[in-house]
Amino acid sequence: MKKFTNHIYYMDNNPETDQPYVYLIHGSKFNLQIDAGNSPENYHKFLSEVKELGLKEPKLLAITHWHWDHTFGMVACNVPMIASVKTNEYLMKAKNWKWTEEAMHDRLKTG
């Protein structure tokens, strides 16, 4: 976890594992997490790093967009989550997708 300012921290991305940047906004009343990461493990790693800094866990999670590498960690989240209406529409659609190689290949062809 790296400190950007007194109120903004971030966990670095890792292109080898498609781990995105995940952010913590440190507020005076509560902390906000930006994006959930690409897996439950990624989500828990973020929380561990927050604790290592002596900061409180986030009380709210904001999702910037629906891509899997920013949302698959949501299944491990136990705080309220917010997203735009458009992002939520895509998340509701994507939750029914199959993740076989064939299904992913078909989605790549059709967009």
Regions found by a protein language model. Give the residues of each.
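Conserved beta-strand hairpin/beta-sheet module of binuclear metal-dependent hydrolase folds
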Residues: K2-E49
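A short acidic, often aromatic-flanked loop/helix-cap motif at beta-alpha or helix-coil junctions
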Residues: T17, E89-Y90
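General N-terminal targeting signals
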Residues: Y21, I25-S28, N42, E49-K51, ...
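Active-site metal-binding motif and surrounding structural segment of the metallo-beta-lactamase
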Residues: E41-T87
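Metallo-beta-lactamase
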Residues: M92-G111
